């Protein structure tokens, strides 16, 4: 069967570069990037060998369009057949799923110390299946999202370790909405492009996070 379209997931895979992809002929070539914030300089070169660029972040989409590429925003968590509202009783006050690295734990500990009940899954051995996670989201009043990148620094090909972190658009925002649950999120410019404050309440500090959580739990 003739192959017409080839997708290349290029992040942190140096061999899938401009020279490798450029040798592939007579197909439509699509570059896919999820962590473009860390490797944009290299990806922007690789993109020159592709026909279309798909980005997890709308900011990256604009960066590629600025360079003349045909680029589109493609959030990977947008399948409503997978992430759906089970209409379960909202018995969990606040849910966080993911790794408790960097200052995430400080934020959550601050909430707990101030009387907020937080359920945590997905850290260390506390894993759940995708179906279990979706049902947990459905039965939660609030999902908590953090936007900072997880590494100690953002290491990319041009800037080395100059930046301590980037604010990323995370999938929890979309997953939560599809499951019928409010997501309260740390600030990121990507989500600011898509959602307003009423759709995704945003915080920058621990005190702001606590105030927003209390406000919505009381309503």
Language model features with spans:
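Short, solvent-exposed loop/turn segments at secondary-structure junctions
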Residues: 11-14, 35-39, 59-61, 77-81, ...
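Extended catalytic core of nucleotide-activated donor transferases of GT-like folds
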Residues: 1-68, 81-83
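Short hydrophobic segments within beta-strands
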Residues: 32, 95-97, 121, 179, ...
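Short active-site oxyanion
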Residues: 48-52, 94, 199
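Catalytic binding pocket for nucleotide-activated donors in carbohydrate/polymer assembly enzymes
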Residues: 1, 58, 66-68, 127-219
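Conserved catalytic-core segment of nucleotide-activated headgroup transferases in glycan assembly
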Residues: 77-142, 148-158, 163
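Proline-centered loop/turn at the N-terminus of a beta-strand
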Residues: 28, 52, 70, 93, ...
